[in-house]
Amino acid sequence: MKKNLLKIICLLIISFFTTSIFADIKVHFIDVGQADSILIQCDGENLLLDGGNKADSSLIFSYLKKYEITNLKYVINSHPHEDHVGGLSGALNFAKANQVFSSFSEYNSKAFNDFVKNTEKQNLQVEVLKAGRELSLGNAKIKVLGPIYYDDKMNNNSLVLHLVYDEISFLFTGDMEFDEERSLLDLDLIPQCTVLKVAHHGSENATSYRLLRSVLPQFAVISVGKNNPYNHPNESVLSKLEDAQTKVFRTDLNGDIIFSSDGKELEILSER
């Protein structure tokens, strides 16, 4: 990554935005509290990665409606935990999906079963997305980095995705913890990125110094709820990010966060 060529424009505004300077790619980190949901728009194509909890279905529905998104090229569930899969039913009830993916095709929970049922209503199946596969979203390229092994601990089965759009890149980590992180780093599978989605809401069980040395992120986003009972984000993770000189954005503090880019310059807009 040619960091010296990357001009960063940070605009934090109180009144939420309707227009950004750059329109080629937008990555929305949606404030779904203690959960994850990310909307990616690129060159007229859309991807939804996770959808928060079941209670967030109406929020996701409204968010897509606000941005007039009626077609999703990809709906991706990083792993079957409810705080990632629950609200995807709202998305599938509003927008037509082309393909639907998860790290599993079956999982015994009501939230995941509802996700499968709503996928089937569109005459689609939940496909297992495996390491090594590459997807395109407009001119952006997305590579599936992991998981490369399946683990008894569901968080370590999170899909890890690396998105590249010209000189800008994002690393999406789901709830990846140290074991999955280590398995990818040992095989040198994690590249540098401009923006890191911090794994597992900033849990103390994720985001090692080794990862940060590999990724060298300029920005990090933590999707986390206010006054959550898990002490997320953990102070140790915030300290590591500070040591890495990474600028941190948090949905509990900043609300919805949108990164917009033309592939060279980056604009960051937040709700608060």
Q: What does each model-identified segment do?
A:
Residues K2-I8, S20-R272:
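Non-globular, low-confidence helical/coil segments that flank catalytic cores
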Residues L12-T18:
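Hydrophobic core
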